[in-house]
């Protein structure tokens, strides 16, 4: 029995291979027209720091108040048809929409991302709610998100553990291996995971507040 309500809102992601990550981010900061065109509430980027599938791996994300708005955005801007500097700065890999399955405090920073095949998404999400509460009670400022792909092709569930610094992210891992009281919740959640598709660390930040 689920004891939580699925929140409103959705995110879109555009996964790219950037020729120069820093220059691409600066370009987006200066040219906000694509973000304004699709009507997102907030936009940003996540740059893969470890566990890359290819050099320059990153994605652009947009937050929307509903799945309706997120889906509608696909008709308002086509990244495959981008011209000018955007076309020259990155190669589009794929895009997706994600629905958060639990409340998620959006504070982009240093994030460990697991891409998972889940056999019981709602039961897993319940465990992540318990885990987040326990980790915070242990003194860590961590946000955990569980996101279901919608129209994402072969994309799988995304689970994000977010800390405000890379060292703090590592400190949580140290606590797990030291046998912290909350570690058993993480271990119990494994029964709902059929496969860990990938495990990466990303640096995420907000770019645009619309």
Where are the language model's segments positioned?
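Boundary of Sec targeting at the N-terminus
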Residues: 4-8
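A short, glycine/Asx- and small/polar-enriched loop/turn
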Residues: 53-58, 153-157
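An amphipathic, aromatic/His-enriched active-site/gating alpha helix that lines ligand/cofactor pockets
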Residues: 26-46, 51-54, 63-97, 130-144, ...
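Surface-exposed interaction/gating patches
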Residues: 13-14, 100-145, 151, 158
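Soluble non-cytosolic domains of exported or imported proteins
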Residues: 18-25, 64, 118-125, 163-164
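Solvent-exposed beta-strand motifs enriched in subsets of small alpha/beta binding domains
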Residues: 12-16, 59-65, 113, 158-162
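An N-terminus-focused feature that recognizes amino-terminal "leader" regions
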Residues: 11, 15, 24-28
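Conserved small/polar residues in nucleotide/adenosyl-binding loops
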Residues: 208-210
